[in-house]
Structures are given as C-alpha cells and as structure tokens.
C-alpha cells in the first residue's frame, strides 16, 4: 500500500452498555491520527434495553460519521460483527468492545499502521485491566492479562482490540469465536498476525470470583471449540509459552507464588469445565453478561 491516507471503519458491538458506551466512543474520537482517516464508527446495538441506543443517538450530532445499527433482539456478538462488516465501505476494520476504551491517544495509529504492509492481515492491541491487583480477584485478572501480553510478545495472541483487512470472512453465528476465527482465515489467505504491544486498550475484568470463573469458562469454551472443529491451536494453551509468560509477568504484578499458584489452579479448573462443555458439542454464541466488568 502507498503511504497515503488509509480509510478505516471502527466497529463496536453493544448490548446494554449504557454505563460505558459514551467513554468508549469518545476514546475513539480522541485518537491522534496521521495518514489514517476514520470513515465511519458503526455501533451495532443488539437488543439493548438500557438506554444504550439513546446515548449513541445523542452523540451522533457531535460526531457526524457515527452510525447506529439496531438489532431488535440480541443475536450474539458474531451476528453484530457480521452486521457492520456488511455495512462498512472500507477494507480495513477495527474491532472495539463497547466496554473498553483506548488507553493512549496514539493507540489506534499504532494498531493500524502495520496493515500498510501487504503481508500483514490482522493486528492486535495490548489489553490493560483497570482492576486493583491488591484484591484477590483483581490480582487474578491482572495476572491473566499480564501473561497474555508476555505470551503475545513470544507468539502473537490477539483479543479485545484488533484491526484487520476484510477478505470476505463472515462469522458463524452458532459459535462465539470472533478474533481467532478471523485470524485463522486471514492466515489461510497467506497473511500474518502482528501483536502491537504499545497499542493500549483499557478493559475491566470481573470483580467477583463467580464472575471470573464464568468469564474464563466461556473464553476457554470458545478456544476448545476452535481446536475441536478446526484443529486450530491457540497459543495460550501452549504450556511452554505459559510458563515463560508467567515468569515474565512478575514485572507487572510482582512475584507472589502462592497467589500465582491459586490462579493457575483456578484456570485449570475453568479449562477442564470448558473442555467438557466443548466435548458435549456446546458453545456460547450468546452469553450472560458479566455485570462487574462494566465499571471501566
């Protein structure tokens, strides 16, 4: 690609995100861009009933290229992603969760820039949780995301924030996997994935143990289904990578061996439960919202 203005579309999936959607949208428009132009920000609200739609509509007068697409009933994230993929006009799409916000004003630029290369098809940002690591569950959240970052530096692992070239892939609505499915198809087309560690996206992890387990089981079910149905290996299941990532994560969370062991055992429990669900043919294309993650 030539070094000219690169048009992109921001896609945001929302379900009852009134508590955080405005901050997420404003974080997009606060980005400093050079040679990258946001054609549209498309919010797909899937069956929201809490005022999310009204908040987006009110912001549309301030941001003329902000667009709302409403799905009357909640159809799942993959359905919402397909909806904005079928509605956008640009090749490059940035996928942002409605309950996240950019952590720096250069994060979007850094995320998209690698896509100028012909051999790069998808990039992933660096999720940073706002949970308090002094709290027991907060420590688990911070450790998991610190390990995610360290592992991604070894072998790219993307999630929460991605940018990609649309090659025509549309997601199965009977599955929950989105980023991994898009990545698999892009890699099959001969392009590679790049992890952008300085493209920061803020998120909020669960605050209760029950919510943490619920979320980890769901995420792991999606990864187990990807392995079962497509024999696609997720790097976070590589034990060698995990050990290296846990050791390196001390830079962020400190060295707390007993807490780390507790988190490791908890994750093993969640993975075992997820594997059992996947083995029975289960998946979670529409999942119960984790309320404690909506306090960014």
Annotated model-derived regions:
Residues 27, 45-54, 73, 100-101:
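A conserved acidic beta->alpha catalytic loop
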Residues 37-47, 69-71:
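Short beta-strand/loop segment that forms part of the nucleotide-sugar
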Residues 90-101:
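Short beta-strand-to-loop acidic/aromatic patch adjacent to the donor-nucleotide binding site
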């Amino acid at each position: 690609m030539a070094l000219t203005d690169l048009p992109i579309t921001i896609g945001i999936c929302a379900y009852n995100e009134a508590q955080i959607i405005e901050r997420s949208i404003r974080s997009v428009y606060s980005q400093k861009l050079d040679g990258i132009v946001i054609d549209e920000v498309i919010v797909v609200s899937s069956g929201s009933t809490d005022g999310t739609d009204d908040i987006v509509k009110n912001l549309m007068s301030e941001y003329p290229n902000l667009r709302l697409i409403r799905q009357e009933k909640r159809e799942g994230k993959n359905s919402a992603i397909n909806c904005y993929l079928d509605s956008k006009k640009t090749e490059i799409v940035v996928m942002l969760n409605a309950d996240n916000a950019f952590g720096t004003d250069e994060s979007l630029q850094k995320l998209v820039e690698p896509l100028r290369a012909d051999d790069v098809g998808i990039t992933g940002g660096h999720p940073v949780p706002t949970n308090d690591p002094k709290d027991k569950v907060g420590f688990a959240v911070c450790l998991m995301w610190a390990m995610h970052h360290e592992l991604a530096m070894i072998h790219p692992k993307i999630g929460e924030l991605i940018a990609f070239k649309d090659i025509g892939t549309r997601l199965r609505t009977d599955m929950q996997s989105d980023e991994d499915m898009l990545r698999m198809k892009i890699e099959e087309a001969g392009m590679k994935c790049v992890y952008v560690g300085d493209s920061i996206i803020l998120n909020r992890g669960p605050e209760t143990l029950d919510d943490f387990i619920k979320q980890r089981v769901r995420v792991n079910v999606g990864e187990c289904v990807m392995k079962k149905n497509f024999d696609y290996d997720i790097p976070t299941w590589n034990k060698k990578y995990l050990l290296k990532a846990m050791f390196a994560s001390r830079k962020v969370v400190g060295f707390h061996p007993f807490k780390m062991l507790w988190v490791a055992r908890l994750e093993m429990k969640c993975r075992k439960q997820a594997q059992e669900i996947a083995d029975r043919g289960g998946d979670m294309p529409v999942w119960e919202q984790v309320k404690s993650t909506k306090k960014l």
